[in-house]
Amino acid sequence: MELGRVRGSVWCTKKSNDLSGCKLLLVEPWDPLGQPGGRLRVCADIIGAGVGERVVLTTGTAARKAIGQPDCPIDAAVVAIVDGCDA
């Protein structure tokens, strides 16, 4: 899992049926000290995070399991909104 901050939303006029009803967010990975770093990721959002919020994201098989669709074509999912972090 990784920490990140939601930078925006992604809208798609056409997408895989597996993604129907799935909100997509643009998330910037952060290190544990709260410094941005890494490439922006498009993440499926299963918890209703908003722009500017700090989040936990997971990738790969864990992301697909998190949204309850093991065959869904996603690589990353937001699984928590961060209230605080001590490092």
Task: Map each language-model feature to its residues.
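A short, acidic/glycine-rich surface segment
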Residues: 14, 38, 63-67
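C-terminal structural segments of small proteins and small subunits
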Residues: 56-87
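Fold-independent oxyanion-binding glycine-rich loops
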Residues: 7-9, 14, 29-30, 45-46, ...
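Short alpha-helix capping/helix-loop boundary micro-motifs
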Residues: 39-44
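N-terminal first-folded block
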Residues: 1-32, 37
